């Protein structure tokens, strides 16, 4: 596959394209949690995830399926938010924390609780220590989407303890936190908590709704060193993709454009082709240059219930058709 240069003159390399496709598939299988089809302490191709999913059992499609172990499954209880799973791909030397998109009634309810509330991290002790040591500044005036902040109320410490245990055994492994739509918003918040606890994850989200006010957007970009990663990428003419906060957005998908009074953080990659398949030449690296507007996301003649709008083709078509616990 040739290296494709974007309008920003930064290339979408075969490595980056492969990573994007791999992690949207890893994100998508989180939908199988609803049917209790992800099993702990098993590899993907040995019952860890459903055999009807090619990504789980076909080593041509996923060569490291037999080396990827499901370590923890987060199944949100009634009234809670945040189903997902933690897995380790020993072939790629990566720890994956993936969150499920909107599935339950509570998920839908949280999607629409859009009024802003004051941000407060889960890891308050670690947060205060970083401020006292001068490593980060306090997130003054920071507000975010109420529905998604509910996640910090239900995200248990089990995830962090398990991750610490894994990285003690495999200190050279990288962390990737990922999700689609609601799962992308939760991945963003989990990534912030991991940074506060001293980890250095790559947060890679797909179809992320806007969740931060302007003050928090700036603070999140500082936390993830967005400016430094952007500058280094331009200097080296190569996207630095081992850590930081990256958002993948699809043309015609209006979810990343709402709510209009919030702001996106991180570095953007834009899929400019509507239909599948989408290849490297269909991806534009935009970085911090967010050019999306709300009107760009709506098609003429679009009608129906809001829940129908959230499942339009453009919102699902991110290298694969992201819809339920499907074949991938």
From Swiss-Prot:
Taxonomy-wise, where does this protein's organism fall, top ranks first? Eukaryota, Fungi, Dikarya, Ascomycota, Saccharomycotina
Query: Which keywords annotate this record?
Result: Hydrolase, Lipid degradation, Lipid metabolism
What is its biological role?
Answer: Lipases catalyze the hydrolysis of the ester bond of tri-, di- and monoglycerides of long-chain fatty acids into fatty acids and glycerol.
Instruction: Return one Gene Ontology term, BP aspect.
Output: lipid catabolic process
MF GO annotations = triacylglycerol lipase activity
Q: Which domain of life is it from?
A: Eukaryota
Q: What is this protein called?
A: Putative lipase LIH1
- Please name the InterPro entries in this protein's record: AB_hydrolase_fold (IPR029058), AB_hydrolase_lip/est (IPR051299), Fungal_lipase-type (IPR002921)
Signal peptide segment: none
Catalytic reaction(s) noted? a triacylglycerol + H2O = a diacylglycerol + a fatty acid + H(+)
Assigned protein family: Belongs to the AB hydrolase superfamily. Lipase family.
**Keyword Hydrolase, does the record have it?**
yes
The UniProt entry, under Pfam families, shows: Lipase_3
């Amino acid at each position: 596959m040739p290296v494709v240069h974007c309008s920003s003159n930064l290339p979408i390399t075969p490595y980056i394209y492969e990573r994007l496709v791999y992690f949207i598939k890893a994100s998508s299988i989180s939908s199988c949690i609803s049917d209790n089809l992800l099993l702990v302490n098993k590899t993907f191709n040995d019952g860890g995830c459903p055999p009807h999913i090619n990504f789980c059992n076909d080593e041509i499609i996923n060569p490291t399926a037999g080396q990827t172990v499901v370590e923890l499954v987060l199944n949100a209880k009634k009234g809670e938010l945040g189903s997902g799973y933690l897995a380790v791909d020993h072939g790629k030397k990566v720890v994956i924390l993936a969150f499920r998109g909107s599935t339950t009634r509570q998920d839908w309810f949280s999607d629409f609780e859009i009024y802003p509330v004051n941000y407060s991290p889960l890891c308050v002790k670690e947060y205060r220590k970083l401020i006292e040591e001068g490593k980060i500044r306090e997130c003054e005036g920071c507000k975010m989407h109420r529905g998604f902040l509910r996640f910090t109320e239900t995200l248990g410490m089990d995830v962090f303890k398990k991750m610490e245990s894994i990285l003690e055994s495999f200190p050279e492994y990288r962390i990737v936190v990922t999700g689609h739509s609601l799962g992308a918003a939760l991945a963003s918040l989990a990534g912030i908590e991991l940074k506060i606890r001293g980890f250095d994850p790559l947060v890679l989200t797909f179809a992320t709704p806007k969740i931060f006010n302007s003050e928090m957007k700036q603070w999140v970009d500082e936390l993830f060193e967005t400016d430094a990663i952007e500058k280094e990428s331009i200097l080296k003419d190569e996207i630095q993709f081992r850590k930081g906060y990256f958002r993948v957005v699809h043309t015609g998908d209006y979810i990343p454009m709402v709510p209009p009074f919030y702001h996106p953080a991180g570095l953007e990659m834009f899929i400019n082709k509507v239909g599948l398949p989408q290849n490297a030449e269909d991806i534009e690296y935009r970085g911090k240059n967010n050019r999306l507007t709300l009107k760009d996301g709506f098609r003429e003649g679009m009608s129906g219930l809001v829940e129908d709008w959230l499942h339009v083709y453009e919102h699902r078509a991110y290298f694969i058709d992201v819809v339920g616990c499907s074949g991938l």
